[in-house]
Design a protein with these regions (language model features):
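Sec/Tat signal peptide C-region and signal peptidase I cleavage site
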Residues: 23-26
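Beta-strand-centric surfaces of beta-sandwich/beta-rich domains
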Residues: 28-210, 215-320
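Bacterial N-terminal signal peptides
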Residues: 10-20
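Bacterial N-terminal signal peptides that target proteins for export
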Residues: 1-12
C-alpha cells in the first residue's frame, strides 16, 4: 500500500471512529424511556449539561402541557445521570407567567414565591396515591422543575448530560375526594464539624394531617436519617435511612396512614476531614438536613407547608 493509501485508510478509520463515538454519545444522552399515560401528560426536562468533576442545579421553566385541569392520582419520575434531587414546583401567584427556559439555581427556590409539588431522589419513582386522593394541576399553569445533577464524589453522570421525565396520570374528577400537599422541611442551621455529629429539627403543624409519604435528604457526610411524629413533647420513629445512596421514598398503605400533628427529623454525620461543613447547595462543600413529606387533606387545591429552622427558630408556614 502506498503512503497516500495508508494515510487515507487511517483518515477513514479515524472518521468512522469519530462518527461511531458521536452516535454513541447521542444515543447515551437521549432521555430515559417512559411510556406515556393514556390519560394524563408527560414532559421531559433536559438535557442538563454536567461537566466532569462538577455539579449543576438547574431550574427549567415551562407550562403544564395540558389546556385542561388535571387531578393526578399516580406519578412517575424517571431520571438519567447522577441525580441528587428532582423537584417540581408551582408559583404561589397563579398569574405568574415566565418565558420557557432554564437557568442555574443552586439554592432552594424562594418559598414565598414557589410551592413544592413533588420531590424524588431516585433514578425511578412510581407512586400511586390512595383512592380518591390527588394532586391538582391547573391547565397550562406555570411550573418549575429543579434538577440537581452531580459528577463527583459518590455520584456520576457518565454521559455528561442529565435528564428527567415526568408522567402525571389523570383521575376522573368525579372520583376525587381529597387533595394532597407537600411539606418541605429544611434545617438551615446545620453544622457538621470533624468527627461524628447530628442535627435535629422539630416542626408542629397548625392542624393534624394524614401522611402519604416521606423521604430524607443530606449530602456526602450523611450516614443516617431518621424521622418521626412530633406532638410538641414526644414522638415515634416512622422512617430510617442508612447511608447516602438511594434514599427510601416511604409510602404509607391506604389502611396504615398515620395522622400527625408534627414531624421531627435527625441527620447523623461522619466527617472524616478537618473541615467544618455548613448549610449550602453543593454536595462536596456543604451539607443539608432536609425532609420532604406529602399529606392530605388540604384546605384548597394547592396547599403546601414549609418548616424552616434558622438561627435556632423554627418557622412553619401554610401556603395556599
Amino acid at each position: 500500500m502506498t503512503a497516500i493509501g495508508r494515510a487515507g485508510s487511517v483518515a477513514i478509520v479515524a472518521c468512522l471512529a469519530s462518527m461511531l463515538l458521536a452516535a454513541s454519545a447521542s444515543a447515551d444522552t437521549k432521555p430515559p424511556t417512559l411510556r406515556r399515560p393514556r390519560s394524563g401528560v408527560q414532559f421531559t426536562v433536559g438535557p442538563v449539561p454536567v461537566e466532569r468533576g462538577k455539579e449543576i442545579t438547574e431550574c427549567t421553566y415551562f407550562k403544564l402541557p395540558s389546556k385542561r385541569d388535571l387531578d393526578v392520582n399516580k406519578v412517575q419520575i424517571k431520571v438519567s445521570g447522577g441525580t441528587h434531587h428532582v423537584h417540581l414546583y408551582r408559583p404561589e401567584d397563579p398569574n405568574l407567567d415566565l418565558a420557557d427556559g432554564h437557568e442555574a439555581c443552586n439554592f432552594a427556590l424562594d418559598f414565598s414565591v414557589w410551592q413544592l409539588i413533588l420531590a424524588s431522589q431516585n433514578l425511578e419513582l412510581t407512586w400511586r396515591l390512595p383512592p380518591g386522593v390527588t394532586f391538582h394541576f391547573r391547565g397550562g399553569e406555570q411550573l418549575a422543575a429543579q434538577t440537581h445533577f452531580v459528577d463527583s464524589g459518590l455520584l456520576t453522570t457518565p454521559t455528561g448530560e442529565g435528564w428527567a421525565v415526568f408522567n402525571l396520570f389523570k383521575m376522573p374528577k368525579h372520583r376525587v375526594k381529597s387533595y394532597a400537599g407537600a411539606i418541605f422541611g429544611q434545617d438551615r442551621d446545620v453544622v457538621v464539624p470533624p468527627g461524628s455529629s447530628s442535627a435535629t429539627t422539630r416542626c408542629t403543624f397548625p392542624k393534624p394531617v394524614k401522611l402519604l409519604a416521606l423521604t430524607g435528604h443530606y449530602h456526602y457526610r450523611g450516614v443516617e436519617f431518621t424521622a418521626g411524629t412530633w406532638d410538641g413533647t414526644t414522638g415515634t420513629e416512622i422512617y430510617r435511612q442508612e447511608g447516602y445512596d438511594h434514599p427510601a421514598f416511604l409510602r404509607f398503605a391506604a389502611n396504615d396512614i398515620p395522622t400527625v400533628t408534627g414531624l421531627q427529623w435527625t441527620c447523623s454525620y461522619v466527617n472524616t476531614t478537618t473541615n467544618t461543613f455548613t448549610f449550602g447547595p453543593f454536595t462536596d462543600n456543604n451539607e443539608h438536613c432536609n425532609l420532604f413529606a406529602f399529606y392530605y387533606p388540604t384546605a384548597g387545591t394547592h396547599e403546601t407547608i414549609t418548616c424552616v429552622q434558622q438561627h435556632g427558630i423554627v418557622t412553619t408556614v401554610v401556603h395556599q
